[in-house]
Amino acid sequence: LPLDFFPSLKQRCKERKIELGCTPFYLKAVQEIYDYVDYYKIASYELLWDSLIEACAETKKKIILSTGMANIKEVMHAVDLCNKKGVDPIVLHCNSSYPSPITDVNLSAIKTLREITNCSVGWSDHSVSINVIMLAIYKWRASHIEFHLDLDGQGEEFSTGHCWLPDQIHKVIKYIRESDIINGSGVKEPSKSEHEERLWRADPDDGLRPLKKTRDLIG
């Protein structure tokens, strides 16, 4: 990503109230993008590069660690590097196959990572599966979801099969927002839409519908 793109990206993100993050792939990039980013993302392939993680952590900005291909020891080492600099990273469970086979997604590792790292844990998606994302959020409580977006299906990486198109991810976001509404408050009480129907229940005295007071009202 050319550095001269960042001022415009930063301004647009500010207008849309979106945080801007970026993945540095060389050490100098950490400082080059410092004034523009709200967080740094360490890609799975750079998770073993201590110097890069330490350079990002020294800025005190938020850090997201993607953990594709990594074992627990490698993940904890990266987390410890951040912690030593006073940063609590966000950890993303990930499968670094493009696209990720459903058989290898292993979403239950989100719980494992959360318990072992004591970090917020999310999911970095390469599956392009609505089911995977919904399960990551609502069964395994993923705190963050990362995905690859191709605007028109013409990008260089689209042919590998791990990128979402705008209409696809729009549907996922719609489902997530609806699910939040569907889950509700958890309080068991009559909903607003049920209030009128309550009048038509069987009366506790004679078992007939509607309630006696409703019968009296309707004659």
Give residue ranges: language-model regions.
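Catalytic cores and adjacent flexible loops of soluble metabolic enzymes
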Residues: L1-G219
